[in-house]
């Protein structure tokens, strides 16, 4: 690249960085009136969770199934779109149209080795769209659509938003959304975009281990404590070392692996059973998506059971060709199959400790977060690493992240009150940020684990005589050459006055905001000309037009979902009325003995005809069901009214109305 380093001290003192963080905190307080209630969403690879700070405490909100965590799954059938449990429960029967693990695709490039590996493991189709992995799926009979990972994530975020709205009884537009601490710039920005598509203002992106640390330390007062958060979830792994001191949460170092978690442990089990089936039954099920769906679900169940049992039986009815599958699985075998992956988690722990400059005996508490930390072997390895120190069981590993996000939301909205006013977060940039200089050298402006928000400037100069344009290429990574780092984006600064090499002064400024997202500016000091980075497609960022289109499509889907629900409700109303009538005319305690024979025949005829019509019109529209209900009522209601008048009972529009009030409830 045509810029060379020019000597000028560029480091900003930690005190100023700290003031920057304090300023951001004060600013958040100043902005508070603009925000409504801010919910906290843990958008997980396998499960998501939502919380809100209310009446002086955090409420983790249960979904419509009564569960406090919701599967991060989306599915399409010919009739509707399903999200959460409903999507996961039908996966084995509808594998190609059921989407999961989308967090492993978000913000990545199609050619990333992780994406190429995942493509072989999921039953749905991942396609290349402008260098990004998109999901191609049949949304209904005869219609196939292509979705970005952001759009699928937005569907899950919408589900979490609606869960919170139902609980709070009002519309929600603001949220704090969490990401793995080791997510890079593109992955953070893509998560923010997903929030926009879901109709949310993402007030802040915060790191999952930091959120979990808040959950752990919210009520901890007293002296300074060093804690290590070990966050092993369904798809990602983070380690953060923090100091907590009377409400101030300062991250000292963070490390991790954005492609390691429970899904990988499930995959090892699946590979083991696929080989076993091939050996025992001479049947290869590795390309049979339905069989794999059943096996995936059973492997996840077995893995969970082995956290509390030493042996389980993996049983699947009619796995393939009508053959029932039944095999024992011991905890020892499970640990052997995943031994290298479990041990892999210790590498980031050591790096984070080294970066924080702490000895093992200086860690006061080890906080476990994420469902995979329930695995006994993982706990054992961690305990051995810290010379026998027991990890803390003080937080719920499934809910801690959403809990912390909800607390941060209450701080931003000003609804936290006395309990949260002392809290201050000082988080860090997880990866070194810099630009390419002559010879492909990575010149670092912001080292990893720098407290954010932060701003750093450095002066560079031209490499050639009379050079009027320089290209600024921005990278993230820890290697000394840019070819081994990740390109975030590039832009040109033009209009530099021609001069001998080494004369022009070009100031490059890196600014990382509180979300961990980077902005870069380059300015020619002589002319005052400046350029800011515009995120290009090679960074994997959605354009504004794409986001707007996706927002419109998300709204259309919401409208379609509403129509589907109205259609189901209309069908249920018709069915309820018909079966009510059928029940009443055959029950002596109700209408059977009070009807004339011709009246009974008329009602029986109307009921029979309506039931046949229902069988023949499984996918009728709402209006058709409403019309049919009116037709049946037109036959039955006058007869019911006449009967009640004859018998001196209350006349009513319908026999259904005189039933117990429970008839008005939705049917399960």
UniProtKB/Swiss-Prot annotation:
Keyword ATP-binding included in the entry's annotation: yes
Q: SUPFAM superfamilies of this UniProt entry?
A: Actin-like ATPase domain, Heat shock protein 70kD (HSP70), C-terminal subdomain, Heat shock protein 70kD (HSP70), peptide-binding domain
Q: Bias regions of kind Acidic residues — which residues? A: 656-668
The family database entries (PROSITE patterns) matched by this protein are listed as: ER_TARGET, HSP70_1, HSP70_2, HSP70_3
Location (main, coarse): endoplasmic reticulum
Q: Where is this motif: Prevents secretion from ER?
A: 665-668
Gene Ontology BP term (one): ERAD pathway
Q: Where is this region: Disordered?
A: 643-668
The answer on whether this UniProt entry bears the keyword Endoplasmic reticulum reads yes
Q: Secretion signal: which residues?
A: 1-28
The record's annotation in Pfam families points to: HSP70
Localization, per the record, is: Endoplasmic reticulum lumen
Give GO cellular component annotations, separated by semicolons.
cytoplasm; endoplasmic reticulum chaperone complex; endoplasmic reticulum lumen; membrane; nucleus
Give me the disulphide-bonded residues.
none
Q: Which GO terms describe its molecular function?
A: ATP binding; ATP hydrolysis activity; ATP-dependent protein folding chaperone; heat shock protein binding; protein folding chaperone
- Supply the alphabetized keyword list: ATP-binding, Endoplasmic reticulum, Glycoprotein, Nucleotide-binding, Signal
Which residues bear sugar attachments? 617
Family (UniProt): Belongs to the heat shock protein 70 family.
What functional role does this protein have?
Probably plays a role in facilitating the assembly of multimeric protein complexes inside the ER.
Q: Tell me the NCBIfam families matching this sequence.
A: PRK00290.1
Q: Which PANTHER family match?
A: HEAT SHOCK PROTEIN 70KDA
Question: Per its record, how is this protein called by name?
Answer: Luminal-binding protein
Question: Which source organism does the UniProt entry give?
Answer: Spinacia oleracea
The beginning of the lineage is: Eukaryota, Viridiplantae, Streptophyta, Embryophyta, Tracheophyta
């Amino acid at each position: 690249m045509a810029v060379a380093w020019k000597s000028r001290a560029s480091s900003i003192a930690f005190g100023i960085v700290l003031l920057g963080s304090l300023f951001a905190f004060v600013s958040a307080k100043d902005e508070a009136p603009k925000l409504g209630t801010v919910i906290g969403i843990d958008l997980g690879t396998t499960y998501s969770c939502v919380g809100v700070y209310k009446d002086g405490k955090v409420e983790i909100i249960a979904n419509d199934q009564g569960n406090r965590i919701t599967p991060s799954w989306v599915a399409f059938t010919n009739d509707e779109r399903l999200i959460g449990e409903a999507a996961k429960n039908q996966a084995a029967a509808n594998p190609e149209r059921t989407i999961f693990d989308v967090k492993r695709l978000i913000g990545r490039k199609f050619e990333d080795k992780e994406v190429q590996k995942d493509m072989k493991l999921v039953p749905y189709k991942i396609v290349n769209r402008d260098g990004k992995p998109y999901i191609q799926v049949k949304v209904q009979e005869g219609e196939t659509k292509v979705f970005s990972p952001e759009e699928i994530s937005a569907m899950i975020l919408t589900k979490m938003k609606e869960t919170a709205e139902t609980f709070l009884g009002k519309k929600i537009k603001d949220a704090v959304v969490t990401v793995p601490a080791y997510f890079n710039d593109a992955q953070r920005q893509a998560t923010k975009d997903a929030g926009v598509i879901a109709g949310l203002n993402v007030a802040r992106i915060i790191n999952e281990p930091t959120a979990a640390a808040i959950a752990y330390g919210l009520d901890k007062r007293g002296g300074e404590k060093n804690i290590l958060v070990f966050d092993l979830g369904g798809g990602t792994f983070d380690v953060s070392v923090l100091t907590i001191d009377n409400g101030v949460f300062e991250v000292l170092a963070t490390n991790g692996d954005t492609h390691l978690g429970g899904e990988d442990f499930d995959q090892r089990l699946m590979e083991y059973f696929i080989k076993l089936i091939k050996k025992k039954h001479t049947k290869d099920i590795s390309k049979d998506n339905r069989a794999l769906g059943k096996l995936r679900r059973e492997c996840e169940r077995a893995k969970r059971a082995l956290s509390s049992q030493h042996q389980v039986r993996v049983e699947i009815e009619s796995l393939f060709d009508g053959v029932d599958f039944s095999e024992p699985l011991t905890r020892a075998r499970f640990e052997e199959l995943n031994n290298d992956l479990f041990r892999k988690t210790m590498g980031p722990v050591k790096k984070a400790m080294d970066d924080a400059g702490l000895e093992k005996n200086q860690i006061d508490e080890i906080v476990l977060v994420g469902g995979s930390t329930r695995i006994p072997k993982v706990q054992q390895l961690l305990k051995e690493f810290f010379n026998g120190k027991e990890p803390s069981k003080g937080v719920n590993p499934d809910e801690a992240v959403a809990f912390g996000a909800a607390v941060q939301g209450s701080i931003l909205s000003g609804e936290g009150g006395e309990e949260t006013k002392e809290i201050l977060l000082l988080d860090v940039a997880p990866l070194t940020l810099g630009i390419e200089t002559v010879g492909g050298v990575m010149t670092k402006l912001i080292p990893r684990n720098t407290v954010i928000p932060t701003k750093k400037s450095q002066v560079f100069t031209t490499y050639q005589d009379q050079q009027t344009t320089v290209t600024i290429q921005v990278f993230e990574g820890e290697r000394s050459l840019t070819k081994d780092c990740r390109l975030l984006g590039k832009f040109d600064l033009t209009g530099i006055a021609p001069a001998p090499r080494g004369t022009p002064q070009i100031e490059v400024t890196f600014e990382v905001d509180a979300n961990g997202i980077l902005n870069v500016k380059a300015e020619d000091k002589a002319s005052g000309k400046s350029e800011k980075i515009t995120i290009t497609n090679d960074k994997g960022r959605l354009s504004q037009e794409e986001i707007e289109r996706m927002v419109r499509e998300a709204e259309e889907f919401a409208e379609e979902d509403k129509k589907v629900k109205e259609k189901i409700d209309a069908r249920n109303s018709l069915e309820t009325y018909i079966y009510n009538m059928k029940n009443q005319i055959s029950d002596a305690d109700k209408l059977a003995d009070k009807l004339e024979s011709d009246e009974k025949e008329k009602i029986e005829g109307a009921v029979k005809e309506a039931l046949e019509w229902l069988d023949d019109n499984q996918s009728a529209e709402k209006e058709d069901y409403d019309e049919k209900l009116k037709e049946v009522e037109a036959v039955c209601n006058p007869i019911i009214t006449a009967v009640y008048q004859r018998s001196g009972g209350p006349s009513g529009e319908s026999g259904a109305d005189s039933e117990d009030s429970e008839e008005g409830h939705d049917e399960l």
